[in-house]
Amino acid sequence: MASAEATPQQQIDQLKVNAGWDMKSNIKAGLLHHEEMEKKATKTVTEYIEKFADVLEENVLRFLQDNAEMLELCIYMYEQLPAYKAVKSRGILSAKRFYDTYVLRTADGSCYESVSHCFMRIAAFCTVQVLTNSALKITILYLGRDKLFKDLPCSPTMDLFIYFFSPLSHQLVCCATPIMRSAGLRDANLASCFLINPDLSTEKSTTTALLQELTMLLSAKSGVGCNVTSFGVDEKCIQSCVGLINSQVEFFNDQNPRPVSVAAYMEVWHSQIQEFLAVKLPENPSRCASIYQGLCIPKLFFEKFIEDPGQNWYLFKPEKSGNLANLYGDEFRSEYERLVGIGCYADAIPIKSLMFLIINTIIKTGSPYIIYKEACNEHHWKNMEGCAIASANLCAEVIQYPGADVSTCNLANVCLPMCLVTVSNDSHSPLEKTYCGNVIESQAVSGVGFSMPILHAAVEVAVFLVNCAIAGGKCVTPGMERGQRERSMGIGVHGLADVFAEMGYSYLDERAARLDVEIFENMYFRAVKTSNNICRLGGGRPFEGWGESKLRHGFFHWQGWEDVNLSIPITEWEKLSRRCISSGVYNSQFIALMPTVGSSLLTGFSESYYPYFANISSKVSSKEEVMKPNMTFWNRVSKEDLDTVRFFSGDVALFPEPLKEKYSLFLSAFDYCAEKQLARARLRAPFVDQSQSHSFHLKEENVVSARFLKDLILSGYTLGLKTIMYYCKVKKQSTMSSFQCLRDQNKSEMTGNDQGVEPESYIKCTAAGGETSEACLHCQ
C-alpha cells in the first residue's frame, strides 16, 4: 500500500522499521503516535476535570476547578513553545512510553490524559502540597523565580504552579515512575522503593514479615530491598524463604503493567550463604527467577582474601552469630575472631571457594549486587555504631537503615542535557546573588557550555518536588510512615554521556572527569542548601533524627573521603556549614544515582551517569519490540557514512579506522575499561551521599575467566565504593545487543592457579533467559 493511502497506524508501523537509525522516521513516527493518541486525549481543563474527577485527590481536584481558566491559558501558552514540540519529537519509543505507562486513562480506556495535562496534574499536586506546608511555601516564594510566561498575570498560587510546571514540562526535572503516574490521585503511593530489615528468626516472625509487611509493600506496586540475614528458622532452608518472596512477586506481577520485585540481601558470614547463592541459578529446579540477590561484604572478608585466599572463612547461624549483624570495621573483626575462637561457627569454607561461588553466580545470573559494609556505614549521615546497615534497595543506590521500620526511596532526577547552553559573553554572570556556579565552556567544541545555574535551579525544584511527594504520598504501612520522618531523598541524573558528547569529550576524557565531579559537587551543594533554606527561611522543622546527623556539626558527606578536590569556593561550603549548624536541614539524604531507565526513554537521552549502552538497541514490552536509537549519535552521522554505520549496527568499536576516530565519542560502556569506570565512580562518590547503581559492562572475552571479575570486585573494594556492583551485563560478540551475565557453563577445563579463585571453567555466552536487565523501573 502506498504511504499516502495508508492509515496513520500503518504509516507508524512503516516508519518504525527504520526508526533505529533514521531520526526523521523515528521522530515522524512519534509525532504521528502523539497525533493519534491526542484524538482520544483530554482537550481542555474542564474536560479533564469531567473525565478524571473520580480518581483525583480532593484538594487537587478543587485546585483544578478553582484555577481552571488560568490553567487553560497556561497550557495554551506552553503548547505554543518550542519545548512542547521538543517533548513530542523525542521519537516513537518516547511517545509509546507516555501513553502506555504514564498518562491516566479512563476505566474503559476511551479517554487518555494529554501529555500537557499529565505535567499539569503533577504540578497541581506539588502546588497543593506547598500550599498546605508553610515552610515549603515561604521558602519558594522567598527564593523567587522568573516567570516562564512573563505576560501571564499570576497570583502567588499560580506562581507556585508555574514553579513546578515549567521544569517538568520542559523535562529539565523528571519524576520517578510512581510520582509521574500517581501524583494527584487518591491514596497514591509515591515512593519508588522500600527497604526492610525484618526479624526472620522464628516461623511466626518470618510469616508475619513476609506475608503481612512485605505483601502490603508489594501491593503498592513498588520494589523492595529485604535483608534476609536473620533467617534461621528451625533448620529451614533459605530456599524456602526466598521462594516465599518469589511467589509473591510473581503474584503481583500477574497482569501488572509495571513489574515489581524484591532484592534479597544476605551477609557473607551466614551459614546458608552457599544455598542463598544457588537460589537463582539456572540449574536449580526450584529457581527463584523473579527476585534479585545482593550481598553485603565486610572489609574483613576482602582483607583475608587478599592476605591468603586459601584460608578458611567461617560461617555462623544467625542465632549463634553474636552481634556480627550490627557491627562493621574493627568491632566486626573483633566479634568475628571471638566467635571463631570459641568455636561458635557452623561451617568453614576456603575463602577463595566462596569468592568463586559469588563470581559463578554473577556470571550465570547477572547478580548478586555487591555492597561494601564499611563504606555504607562509615559514610552514612549518622554514626552507625551498634546498628549497621547491611542491605540496600532494589537498584542498590539507596543506602538507609530501616531498623524495625520501613525506609523509603523518594526519587527524582535531572535531565543534564537540558543544562547545555550556547555560550555568550555574559554566560559567566550568575543568575542570582547567592552562589549558583557559572557556565563551564567546552574546551573541545566552540560555543557550547554546561550551565551550573540551570543545574542549581533544577536541583532546587527537585528538592521541593520530592518533599511534596513525601508529604502527599500515602504510607501503606505504619512502618513506612515512621520511616518517612527522616525525609530521605535521592536526586539523580540522566544524559551525562550526551553532555560529554555534545561538549566533544569522550567518556573517560580527563576534561569529562572534571566536569563529572563538578556536576555532582554542585548538585549536593544545592540540595543541602535548599534543604537548609526550608528550615532557615521557611521555618521548617528538621527531619526526625537531626540530632544524630553529622550535618548537625557542619560535617558534609565529602569530608569523610580522602583526596577530594572542590570546585565550589571553600568559603561557600563554610557558610553553608554554619547555616546547617544554626538552622538544621529538612532532609537526611540528598543524592542517589539510580538507573533512570524510564526517564531516559521519555527524553531520548542516555541512562543515568553511564556511558552509552549502545547506539542501536531495543525495548521489549508485553505488546511489541521498539527500536531505541542513540539520538545524539544518529543526528551526527553523515549521509556518506550511513551505510557503513548501519552495516556495523552503530557499534563504533567495529568501524574501520577513519570512522572509528570520527565517531569515537560514541563508544559504548562495553568499550571502555571497566576499572576506569569504577575509578570515575570513586571520583564522584564523595558528593553522592547515598550511592550509585554502578553496573559492570563487560565483553564476552572478559568473562571467560573468573579472574577478571575477581579483580573488578577487589578494585571496587580498594576504591571504597558503597555499591561495588549493581548489575553485570555482558555484550555478546556476535550481536549488537548486550545481555546480562546468564551463562551456560560447559566443557569444564579445571586448571590450578594461585590467584585466589577456584579453577576456571569455559563459559559460553547466551542471552539472559527472559529476564529484564534492570530490577525495577519504579526507581527510574
Curated annotation (Swiss-Prot):
Residues at the catalytic site: N393, C395, E397
InterPro entries reported in the protein's UniProt record: HSV_RIR1 (IPR034717), NrdE_NrdA_C (IPR013346), RNR_lg_C (IPR000788), RNR_lsu_N (IPR013509), RNR_R1-su_N (IPR008926), Rrm1 (IPR039718)
Record flagged with keyword Nucleotide-binding: yes
Binding-site residues for substrate, renumbered to this chain: T177, S192, C193, G223, N393, L394, C395, A396, E397, P595, T596, V597, G598, S599
Keywords: ATP-binding, Disulfide bond, DNA replication, Early protein, Nucleotide-binding, Oxidoreductase, Viral latency, Viral reactivation from latency
Subunit composition and interactions: Heterotetramer composed of a homodimer of the large subunit (R1) and a homodimer of the small subunit (R2). Larger multisubunit protein complex are also active, composed of (R1)n(R2)n.
PANTHER family: RIBONUCLEOSIDE-DIPHOSPHATE REDUCTASE LARGE CHAIN (PTHR11573), RIBONUCLEOSIDE-DIPHOSPHATE REDUCTASE LARGE SUBUNIT (PTHR11573:SF6)
Family note: Belongs to the ribonucleoside diphosphate reductase large chain family.
HAMAP family, A to Z: HSV_RIR1
Protein name (Swiss-Prot/TrEMBL): Ribonucleoside-diphosphate reductase large subunit
Organism (species): Alcelaphine herpesvirus 1 (strain C500)
Organism classification: Viruses, Duplodnaviria, Heunggongvirae, Peploviricota, Herviviricetes
